[in-house]
From Swiss-Prot:
Protein name listed in UniProt: N-acetylgalactosamine kinase
GO cellular component annotations of the record: cytosol
Annotated active site: D190
Family according to the record: Belongs to the GHMP kinase family. GalK subfamily.
NCBIfam families xref list: gal_kin
């Protein structure tokens, strides 16, 4: 249940090769044995892209890949972080002087986000120190939310070290808020599914208030992740934050057009809620109120009756101050149509008609087209990969995660899975230039996994 704390489970470490290896590496690194372990999963968003931060429901599931941290509280105030991957250097600092550098999305900063979120929630000035060894098997910058899984894992680590309790919902909200310390204006989907996920089911995640509903996926289909091998680091690019701002500006212009108090409006969902109309009707309002040609800052100011200075200081975020072009019509059209597709997807899953897989696949395909054409968050490699997946039997295929690289998710009839994997591997990954990542991490079927939990050695 969402109101419960994350589970604590006792395990025989010797029976779990990854845990055993982590324990041995921890002992080698710190000269002691971990007191406990925490795991938090990555996720794949099946449908509902770039709409969580606009206030709309999304439909993700946790993947089996996760971040796993071995932890030992210490009596000093020193925080020592190490990673099993040599690409990520060791880091140490005082637990009472947490500094997060927004300009550098270094791996340890994501841990610090989770720690700081819990510290601030409880208003603690003195935190106990800890030694932590991090191991992750979620491909980084792939759109499977490795960074948010690390934030969530660190939040639960800190909570456990403190001996405090919070519900899964509270933890998800704290971690979503604290990830913004690193400059990412996300909406909370990644953190919510990391805590609220349950094995065997996808979840409809709703916001304000945060809640999760089981969505039973079709039994005759398998979801396959395929990595384009184009890395996209969310916090290191302005693309993501520009989209957040375009949605905010679109919401304000739509509110002004409908004579609402626009200055209080931040999200596209708020406009719909205030007008009390359907998503389909909101698409018609968007057609009337906004034009397809890009807006410049001066035109936005004219529409809202404000100065450029007011636009910059009161509305734009620090990292969008210098943007000269805003595509408001396209972004609003994507958000309202994608929000409708999420609800249709859930409805089809509930009603389970005979042609369920075909109908769900069509929604996934429409979602990708909207991400590509209206939200412009795809890239040539993702489009090529989606085409290949559909060609070899996927009923639906789309980019998943922020986009601009990362992964696709495809819904494949279970009986076609072996030939699908073989053909996609041959068509996309077996290239003469040898520049792509190992296929094992890049192409795999997945089923809904469980959420974050604490592991104690039995």
């Amino acid at each position: 249940m969402a109101t419960e704390s994350p589970a604590t489970r006792r395990v025989q470490v010797a029976e779990h090769p990854r845990l055993l290896k982590l324990k041995e590496m921890f002992n080698s690194k710190f000269g002691s044995i971990p007191k406990f372990y925490v795991r938090a999963p990555g996720r794949v968003n099946i449908i509902g892209e770039h709409i969580d931060y606009c206030g709309y429901s999304v439909l993700p599931m946790a993947v089996e890949q996760d971040v796993l941290i071995a932890v030992e509280p210490v009596k000093t105030y020193a925080l020592q972080l190490a990673n099993t991957n040599p690409l990520y250097p060791d880091f140490s600092t005082s637990a009472n002087n947490i500094q997060i550098d927004k300009t550098k999305p270094l791996w340890h900063n994501y841990f610090l986000c989770g720690l700081k979120g819990i510290q601030e929630h409880f208003g603690l000035s003195n935190l106990t120190g800890m030694n932590c060894l991090v191991d992750g098997n979620i491909p980084p910058s792939s759109g499977l939310s490795s960074s948010s899984a690390l934030v969530c894992c660190a939040g639960l680590v800190t909570l456990t070290v403190l001996g405090r309790n919070l519900s899964k919902v509270e933890l998800a909200e704290i971690c979503a808020k604290s990830e913004r310390y690193i400059g990412t204006e996300g909406g909370g989907m990644d953190q919510s599914i990391s805590f609220l996920a349950e094995e065997g089911t996808a979840k409809l995640i709703e916001f304000s208030p945060l809640r999760a509903t089981d969505v039973k996926l079709p039994s005759g289909a398998v979801f396959v992740i395929a990595n384009s091998c184009v890395e996209m680091n969310k916090a290191a690019t302005s693309h993501f934050n520009i989209r957040v701002m375009e949605c905010r500006l679109a919401a304000k212009l739509l509110a002004k057009y409908k004579s609402l108090q626009w200055d209080k409006v931040l999200r596209l969902e708020e406009v719909q809620a205030k007008l009390g109309i359907s998503l389909e009707e909101m698409l018609l309002v968007t057609e009337d109120a906004l034009h397809p040609e890009p807006y410049n800052p001066e035109e936005i100011c004219r529409c809202l009756g404000i100065s450029l200075e007011e636009l910059r200081t009161q509305i734009l975020s620090p990292n969008t101050q210098d943007v000269l072009i805003f595509k408001l019509y396209q972004r609003a059209k994507h958000v309202y149509s994608e929000a409708a597709r999420v609800l249709q997807f859930k409805k089809i899953c509930e009603e389970a008609p005979e042609n369920m897989v075909q109908l769900l696949g069509e929604l996934m395909n429409q979602s990708h087209m909207s991400c590509r054409d209206m939200y412009e968050c795809s890239c040539p490699e993702l489009d090529q990969l989606v085409d290949i997946c559909r060609k070899f039997g996927a009923q639906g295929s789309r980019l998943t995660g922020a986009g601009w690289g990362g992964c696709t998710v495809s819904m494949v009839p279970a009986d076609k899975l072996p030939s699908f994997l073989a053909n996609v591997h041959k068509a996309y990954y077996q290239r003469s230039d040898g520049s792509l990542a190992p296929e094992k991490q890049s192409l795999f079927a997945t089923k809904p996994g469980g959420g974050a939990l604490v592991l104690l050695e039995a």
